[in-house]
């Protein structure tokens, strides 16, 4: 996996990431170049129902928050599972993902695998952009080559803009 942001329920209201910028990055042979995962399971209780439940839960002092996240001037070659995999909490969606001047190319011989470390997610291969529970996505000059199926797979995405 390439550039990842990982959090989960239970990390708390002080687990806030906002204004993060990834810029001028080159990646080769990564499984999934961009992963934002709010169902991260690598903690002792990470596989429990509180962390992995896909239904909205009350927002409380244990709910993390992901604000504005920006990726600019990035090239990823020979990706495998997914180009972009953004998985927010239903009760606390990812606020904003902005991508500018990004190129992702898939390995022609890619194998299927798990794009994010979360339970009950299907194995994927050459998945272009997956987003669930994201309030705002903006793509400017984002090129993805060699993907299979639909370019965009969205669920509960508020505003989407691409140019």
Predicted regions and their residues:
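Extracellular/periplasmic carbohydrate-active domains that bind, remodel
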Residues: 1-163
């Amino acid at each position: 996996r390439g550039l990842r942001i990982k959090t989960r329920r239970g990390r708390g209201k002080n687990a806030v990431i906002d204004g993060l910028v990834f810029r001028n990055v080159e990646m080769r042979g990564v499984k999934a170049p961009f992963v934002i995962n709010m169902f991260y399971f690598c903690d002792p209780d990470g596989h429990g129902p509180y962390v992995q439940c896909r239904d909205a839960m009350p927002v409380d002092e244990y709910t993390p928050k992901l604000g504005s996240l920006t990726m600019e001037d990035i090239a990823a070659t020979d990706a495998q599972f997914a180009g972009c995999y953004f998985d927010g909490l239903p009760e606390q969606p990812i606020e904003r993902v902005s991508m500018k001047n990004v190129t992702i190319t898939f390995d022609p011989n890619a194998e299927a695998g798990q794009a994010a470390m979360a339970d009950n997610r299907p194995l994927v291969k050459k998945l272009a952009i997956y987003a669930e529970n994201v309030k705002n996505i903006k793509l400017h000059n984002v090129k993805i080559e060699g993907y299979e199926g639909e370019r965009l797979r969205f669920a509960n995405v508020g505003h989407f803009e691409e140019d």
